[in-house]
Design a protein with these regions (language model features):
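A glycine-rich beta-to-alpha transition motif near the start of alpha/beta enzyme domains, typified by
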Residues: 1-167, 176-336
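Glycine-rich ThDP/TPP pyrophosphate-binding loop and its adjacent helix/strand module
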Residues: 172
Length: 336
């Protein structure tokens, strides 16, 4: 056996969403920021993304995290996110799993009762607080990048539904926030495939009438995720949501950046105050508890700093991926 490439990964999950944290095997990435390093991988090493994330080594719903040397002196590590289709500057569920991997493998020194980790992402610096009880991780808490409501009541022409009002928000990624009740739908395991299909039409319709641009990070200028929201709470007070990302992939977790975005939506619509807890749930039973820590501004745009907590983050395995030179499928593939 002649292996031309080795990649070391730690697999984890955040409320069921599979996260693959790449800890070794990526060539040194060039750039003066993690955003530039992500672009270097996109331009010059994209075959590694497809190799790691696609079949036969990966699968469609897998989320990847690439650890790098940070460029900011404040950060412990740099990180950006990948999936089978593309790159993402931020992933909340992924960041929670990254923190779990860093503390459990000794890549960051464990400090009890709380370990603080600063990560440089293409969206900016985020801080993660790992809380310990009885020498075990009890919860992982993300102080995310500022979140804001980009556009209220945007009207789109949605095929089969006519005129539909949605909001556009940002919490690490840009989202179309769609109220499922206004579409005559609910969020259940049985409707997820319908929501996946509908997300493509929603994104196409929204991108026809709006061009997004982050107020201080011009490279973040694309709208490619939909967060379907049930705005009537469950009996336990939580709110169901379903994020659709990538190639119409359904997030298994409640979605960390989506939770941050929805928190900002509710805050700027006057439905919740700072330090009030908002619980976003997935149909698979996962829950993220979020609150707004404080107000801020981004290039004059009002925003809040979200704090997202989860107690269901676990390591599932350690893997040494190899690429044999004569493997015809070494670059990966997507079947269906």
């Amino acid at each position: 056996m002649l292996a031309s490439q080795s990649v070391f990964v730690v697999d984890a999950h955040t409320t069921g969403t599979p996260i693959r944290v790449v800890t070794g095997g990526i060539p040194p990435l060039k750039g003066a920021s993690v955003a530039e390093k992500m672009e270097d991988m996109r331009r010059n090493h994209d075959w590694l993304r497809t190799c790691i994330m696609q079949q036969p080594r990966g699968f469609l719903s897998l989320v990847g995290a690439i650890l790098t040397e940070p460029c900011s002196p404040e950060a412990d590590y740099g990180v950006f996110y990948i999936d089978s289709l593309t790159y993402q500057p931020m992933c909340g569920a992924g960041t929670l799993s990254v923190a779990k991997v860093l503390v459990e493998t000794g890549m960051v020194k464990r400090v009890e009762p709380e370990t603080k980790i600063v990560l440089e992402t293409p969206t900016g610096l985020v801080t993660v607080y790992v809380k310990w009880e009885n020498h075990m991780v009890a919860s992982i808490n993300l102080e995310n990048v500022p979140a804001f409501l980009y556009r209220k009541d945007l009207h789109i022409d949605l095929a089969g539904y006519g005129d539909v009002s949605v909001d556009i928000g940002y919490g690490g990624n840009f989202f179309v926030l769609a109220d499922v009740h206004s579409l005559g739908l609910t969020i259940t395991k049985d409707t997820v495939n319908l929501l996946r299909s509908l997300s493509k039409d929603i994104l196409a319709a929204a991108n026809k009438v709006i061009k997004v641009a982050h107020p201080t990070n011009p490279a973040i200028n694309y709208l490619d995720q939909v967060l379907f929201c049930q705005n009537v709470p469950e009996e336990d007070g939580g709110y169901l949501a379903q994020c659709i990302f990538g190639d119409a992939q359904a997030d298994i977790s409640p979605c960390g950046t989506g939770t941050s975005t929805r928190l900002a939506q509710r805050y700027f619509r006057g439905l919740i105050g700072l330090e009030e807890t908002f619980v976003q749930k997935s149909v698979c039973g996962g829950a993220f508890h979020a609150k707004g820590l404080r107000e801020t501004t981004l290039g004059g745009v009002p925003a809040i700093v979200p704090y997202v907590s989860c107690s269901d983050v676990h390591i599932t395995g350690f893997n040494h991926l190899i690429v044999e030179e004569n493997d015809k499928l070494k670059n990966g593939f997507v079947s269906w």
